[in-house]
Structures are given as C-alpha cells and as structure tokens.
Amino acid sequence: MIYGLGTDICDIRRIRASLERHGERFAQRILSDAELATWTARSARWPDRGVSYLATRFSAKEAFSKAIGLGMRMPMTWRHCEIANAASGKPEIVLHGALKDWFDARQLTAHVTVSDETDYAASFCVVEKK
C-alpha cells in the first residue's frame, strides 16, 4: 500500500551558489559521511559533477521527506537520510539513527529515482507500507 509520494526539482545553479557562499560546510550539512566521501572525490576530479552529485542528493532527500509526510522536521535530518547506489547503479535510501527507528517502526519501504541535466536535478520517491 502506498504511504506517500514525494517529488522535488532542484536548480543546480542554486546549489553551486550555496557552495560558493558557504564552501564545504554546505555539503557537510547535507551529506552523510559516505556521501561526503563520494562528493569530495568527484569534486576533486570533476567539479561540475561534484555539484550535480550534491544537487541530486539534496533533491532526493527533499522528495523523501515529502513522501514520509514530515518535511524537514525531526526525526528527518539531512545526514540521517543517505542516498546510496546499488551495484547496478540504482539509487537506494539508507536511513540512520532516529529516522531509521521511526521509519522501521511504521514498517515502511522506500523507492527513489534521481535525474539531472545541466541546470536541474529532479527526484521522485514512493514510500510503501510493507
């Protein structure tokens, strides 16, 4: 049974501007430790891909927060929601801490998709009750 749906579109230029204003602190606020390691590696080699990576993660977390009906309120936090990739490349949501406990207590499962182009990143999330 569908519990919730969420979608988000993110202007990559806004993410780039935030990075220019706040530096790495902005990424540290949004990304989990694992995501931050990936972002750092991509940014060092291909700065534009690093910005796109951050934008897709931002967008996916926004879509997820809408699908669970909390928005960006506790227990939903940027760093407790991680967008990982399966070996196939498929994006997967990995939760941590109080958010994981909250999600598991409700017997929910989530599916997410992300896409990006030159100026925009978009995400769609479906949350189901098991």
Swiss-Prot record:
It comes from Polaromonas naphthalenivorans (strain CJ2). One of its GO terms (molecular function) is magnesium ion binding. Belongs to the P-Pant transferase superfamily. AcpS family. The keyword Repeat does not apply. HAMAP family: AcpS. The gene is acpS. Transfers the 4'-phosphopantetheine moiety from coenzyme A to a Ser of acyl-carrier-protein. Gene3D superfamilies: 4'-phosphopantetheinyl transferase domain. This is Holo-[acyl-carrier-protein] synthase. Its main location: cytoplasm.
